[in-house]
Amino acid sequence: MPALRRLFALLSDLRLAILLLLLIAGASALGTILPQNEAPDLYLERFNADPWLGMINGEQMLQLQLDSIYSSVWFLSLLAWLGLALILCSWRRQWPALLATTRWIDYRQPRQLSKLALAESILCSNGESALDTLSEELQKQGWQVQRNEDRLAARRGVIGKVGPLLVHTGLVLLLIGAAWGALSGNRLERFLAPGRALDLLDPSGNNRLSLTLERFAIERDPAGRTEQFRSTLRLDPPGGPSEQRMISVNHPLRYRGMTVYQADWSLAAITVQIGKSPELQLPLRSFPELGEQIWGLVLPTRPDGSEPVLMSTSSEQGPVQVFDADGSLLGNLRPGGASTEIKGLPLRVANIMPASGLLLKRDPGVPLVYAGFAITLLGGGLSLIATRQLWAVLDPAPFQPSNRKLHIGGLCNRNLAGLAAELPRLISRVDESRD
């Protein structure tokens, strides 16, 4: 039992909770620095050649679960440990403190008041009248008053004691929501070309929703830089009516617990005409070795596949640059423009099809996270309310029956200086009533 009590005391220690918060904050910051939820080959290729911090290679990063920090065993264990520490701290400290505040403390002797942080005494010709005046004045100022024959107790701001308990409750809900989202949430990134659909299945394999990209538009400034991109989506739930929604950067779509973000854009295909051939739609792929946002394809110019040329572009507006095998520029083609002779063949670009980069997230813990955050804010605001307590006791044994001393004392959990300034004003009101 002593060992169990020591363990209980350790787990409910506020210093431990603060340490766990710092560790979780550090791990969360680490997750923003390191790439998360990528293919294992990416970590092996990137960090085996250049170890992180000079000592953690790709294999060690995968073993330490640094590729998926927010759903790793050690991160979720930290969340569970912090949640347990907050629950035990609330049970051991905050709940008893709240119960103690709701109970009236009945001080009967003046010497008990003299030990309080604030204590004053005044001589009254009519002690009962002075107590009545003090009681009325306190009630006018919003104090709760408990009046007895020769004494009174008053308190104000008791709701402030609820604040710390609400903060702990909100943090626990936030942690539960974060853990639930990490364990049960889903994340999917896809590029869709206009007219293409994405079928979303439930865990049983049944079609839950069909998502079709009807239109995709990229807005650019006069210099050609991307300013905004928008997708018009059609949602087809099984057995339900279709809905059309538009999303853009910073304006996602929320639908039945799922959130669809406009995350990126790409180029999907190019439509070309070679000589008198029909228009051919050919897929594009990215060429990171040529630049950050460069797409293209290798196109043979002879029936036997020889003498290929590289067609590359960085925008759906063009131009499309055509390079020979030795890297020399053969020409620039504009989408929708006239054909240009390339190696003896007329080559025309009809259009370039952009693709919308969609990020789909389903996080069942989000409502709990929001609720926990709101409760934490509410508790933090209530915690700022000072809880004040005041007692007044008439001297039980006056030397002269007509003159009795009224002893007044008070406590405050914060802003004691404010109560110290308020106490003389209360005493002055009592003095005025005697005159």
Swiss-Prot record:
Keyword Thylakoid applies = yes
**Which Pfam families would you find in this protein's record?**
ResB
Q: Where are the transmembrane segments?
A: 14-34, 72-92, 162-182
Q: What domain of life does the UniProt record list for this protein's source?
A: Bacteria
Name the UniProt key words of this record, in alphabetical order: Cytochrome c-type biogenesis, Membrane, Thylakoid, Transmembrane, Transmembrane helix
Q: Which GO terms describe its biological process?
A: cytochrome complex assembly
Q: What GO CC terms are in its UniProt record? A: plasma membrane-derived thylakoid membrane
Q: What is its main location?
A: membrane
| Subunit structure, as described in the record | May interact with CcsA.
PANTHER family xref list: CYTOCHROME C BIOGENESIS PROTEIN CCS1, CHLOROPLASTIC
User: What name is this protein filed under?
Assistant: Cytochrome c biogenesis protein CcsB
Q: What is the lineage of its organism?
A: Bacteria, Bacillati, Cyanobacteriota, Cyanophyceae, Synechococcales
